[in-house]
Regions:
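Terminal-region recognition feature
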Residues: 2-191
């Protein structure tokens, strides 16, 4: 019996993003087959480069088709400003972004977890969430330290308001919960 003709698989989709050297474009593979399933992965510290990667993928998938996107998270957190950029894009795109905690969603990563579609956020049974208030590390002249402290307080106020909206908790409860490193199981985070 004759053999069937071999089928060709589609090449993996690639997303362009600019790397730190401003004259070089680099193509990246989006975590294997996950990309074709509209799955994105945040699995490291939140910094400008990582957020630019996730944002580029989110925007590309949204431009390709308005449909559910899934953001899996296992991150220690990181830059508040970079995280807020991802939050803004998640709210901007037409595609619903469903978030899932698959390990640790700490600090800014917990905020991104909460930014997913309400009622569709997922935390695996052994995952953990940690929230706390934003931190700064200013050094130098007293005026510089004062200016940074004011900015941190403004960011804290913004985060408190947004956490309250995302979770349905009161501002007072959110302020209390952010007062220290607050580790929670998946079940405790749900409550």
């Amino acid at each position: 019996a004759p053999r069937p003709a071999p089928t060709r698989s589609r090449p993996p989709r690639m997303v362009a993003y600019r790397v730190p050297q401003p004259t070089k474009e680099e193509w990246i593979r989006s975590h294997g087959g996950l990309y074709g399933s509209r799955v994105l992965y945040l699995g490291q510290e939140i910094d400008d480069e990582e957020m630019n990667r996730v944002i580029a993928e989110l925007l590309f998938l949204d431009a390709e088709e308005v449909a559910n996107q899934y953001l899996y998270i296992n991150s220690p957190g990181g830059s508040v400003i970079a995280g807020l950029a991802l939050y803004d894009v998640m709210q901007h795109v037409g595609s619903p972004v469903i978030t899932a905690n698959i390990g640790m969603a700490a600090s800014m990563a917990s905020f991104i977890l909460g930014a997913g579609v309400r009622g569709k956020r997922v935390a695996l049974p052994n995952s953990r969430v940690m929230i706390h208030q934003p931190m700064g590390g200013s050094e130098g002249q007293a005026e510089d330290v004062r200016v940074e402290a004011e900015q941190i307080m403004k960011i804290k106020n913004t985060l408190v308001t947004m956490y309250a909206q995302m979770t349905g908790q009161t501002r007072e409860r959110v302020i209390q919960d952010l007062g220290r490193d607050n580790y929670m199981s998946a079940q405790a985070a749900l409550e």
